[in-house]
């Protein structure tokens, strides 16, 4: 049963499901992990076949997909649209209130996929050689399935929860999230009252080429996007008569100063901790230096070597990338206006306002206008949350040589919408991923290993149960 009310859609309890899946704690059923793992594969195949490319999004299709699964299992859900077709879905299992809520978030939109360059249909859900292909398999429809099955498994098992468990599927993350996480946090803050933690994309279980787990990475901080446009104006004219002070020339001179500017090195707590935790994985000659990265970067020779890797360089300084240039649309016309856009990423303890003043000093031309296109306030999550303790338990059980650590995310996710309201949000994909895995995110032939999906789904279910204060019953033996 569904009723539309403006941009809101409620999906009620399935009568048949309600009569069969509600169980008291005393009647808690065993868990057949093999069946759940197989269900994760089939569910992700179906989910990948729903095209939620952003733009335009059409995330309501994805929301309705989950709403049906929830209704079939006696779980009420609500879909709220920020605009027609731009759906966000929430579903909740109630606990007894002795612990705070756990929110399981993923984004339902995906980036475009050009089928000409794929070896499989980007929206076909094809399995080949043990891998499941489709746009969003990792980013983040696979996580959405693991989150949904956490909710469904807890419901079906009749387990008593201490805290609420909330499924949240949002729109628009790939375009900044204003119509997704930003919208629901602003318009429905009551959904998140009494929340202990939001689990989102970002961190991951890192594995080596042989599949051995080397660390559990929890993203507690990310760099701050600070996008600006530089605009120069001047007298237009014919290209045959150059103007030394033309808009284009002044802009190029300003950009030359920006490109030549080297921002100072700075090691934030998450980066210092990450390299200390993982130094033992590096070649032996580098281990002492990485164990105290902040001190080691004071050595110019080491700093030069370390920052020659563009990924490492981005972790220890504010970065500026020139990404767009606009001027005349004709070769023989000197434009009246020329502009450039800069993608600036600030370390999580930096102040965008202060950096803007520093940028203007570097530009050193008061005639150049600097416009802010995008800026988020700095926000991080604490490093002493229960989540870290639970993952240490898992590491001790499943990968005794692995550590739990805090990689800094160079990009940004929807976590900032929650951190800005003092709600702890952490990035943690429950999947064991390696360099090859990340190489296909936003690329051609995005895919996830079937075994990786199955194992990650179980990890998420076990993690959520722990955080919600629930004890999982013994699973049924595999056939």
Regions found by a protein language model. Give the residues of each.
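A short core secondary-structure module
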Residues: 182-186, 235, 240-264
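An extended, acidic, His-containing surface patch that forms the Zn2+-binding/catalytic region
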Residues: 97-99, 204-207, 266-329, 336, ...
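N-terminal helical capping/dimerization or prosegment-like subdomains
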Residues: 29-115, 337-339, 352-353
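Boundary at the C-terminal end of the N-terminal hydrophobic targeting segment
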Residues: 23-28
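Bacterial N-terminal signal peptides that target proteins for export
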Residues: 1-13
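Active-site metal-coordination/substrate-binding segment of hydrolases
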Residues: 99-166, 451
């Amino acid at each position: 049963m569904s009723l539309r009310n403006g941009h809101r859609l409620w999906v009620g309890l399935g009568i048949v499901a309600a009569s069969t899946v509600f169980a008291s704690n005393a009647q808690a059923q065993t868990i057949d992990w093999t069946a759940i793992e197989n269900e994760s594969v089939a569910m992700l195949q179906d989910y990948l076949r729903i095209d939620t490319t952003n733009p335009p999004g059409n995330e309501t299709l994805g929301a309705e997909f989950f709403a049906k699964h929830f209704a079939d299992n006696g779980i009420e859900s609500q879909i709220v649209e920020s605009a027609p077709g731009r759906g966000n879905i929430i579903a909740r299992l109630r606990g007894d209130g002795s612990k705070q809520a756990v929110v399981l978030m993923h984004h339902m939109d995906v980036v475009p996929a050009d089928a000409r360059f794929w070896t499989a249909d980007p929206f076909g859900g094809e399995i080949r050689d043990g891998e499941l292909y489709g746009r969003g398999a990792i980013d983040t429809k696979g996580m959405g399935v693991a989150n949904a099955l956490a909710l469904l498994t807890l419901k079906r098992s009749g387990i008593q929860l201490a805290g609420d468990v909330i499924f949240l599927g949002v729109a628009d993350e790939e375009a900044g999230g204003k119509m997704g996480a930003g919208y629901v946090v602003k318009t429905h803050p009551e959904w998140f009252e009494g929340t202990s933690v939001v689990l989102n994309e970002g961190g991951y279980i890192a594995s080596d080429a042989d599949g051995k787990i080397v660390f559990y990475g929890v993203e507690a901080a990310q760099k701050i996007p600070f996008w600006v446009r530089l605009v120069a104006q001047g007298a237009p004219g014919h290209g045959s008569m150059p103007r030394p002070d033309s808009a284009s020339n002044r802009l190029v001179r300003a950009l030359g100063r920006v490109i030549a500017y080297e921002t100072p090195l700075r090691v934030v707590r998450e980066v210092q901790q990450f390299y200390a935790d993982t130094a033992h994985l590096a070649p032996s000659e580098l281990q002492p230096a990485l164990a105290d990265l902040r001190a080691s970067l004071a050595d110019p020779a080491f700093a030069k070597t370390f920052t020659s890797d563009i990924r490492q360089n981005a972790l220890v300084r504010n970065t500026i990338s020139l990404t767009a240039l606009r001027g005349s649309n004709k070769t023989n016309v000197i434009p009246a206006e020329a502009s450039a856009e800069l993608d600036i990423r600030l370390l999580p303890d930096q102040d965008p306002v202060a950096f803007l003043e520093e940028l203007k000093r570097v530009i050193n031309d008061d005639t150049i206008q600097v416009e802010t296109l995008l800026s988020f306030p700095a926000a991080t999550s604490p490093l002493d949350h229960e989540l870290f303790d639970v993952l240490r338990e898992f590491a001790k059980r499943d990968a005794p040589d692995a550590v739990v650590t805090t990689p800094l995310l160079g990009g940004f996710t929807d976590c900032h919408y929650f951190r800005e309201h003092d709600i702890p949000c952490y990035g943690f994909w429950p999947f064991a991923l390696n360099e090859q895995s990340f190489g296909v995110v936003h690329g051609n032939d995005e895919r996830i290993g079937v075994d990786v999906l199955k194992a990650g789904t179980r990890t998420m279910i076990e993690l959520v149960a722990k955080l919600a204060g629930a004890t999982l019953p013994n699973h049924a033996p595999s056939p």
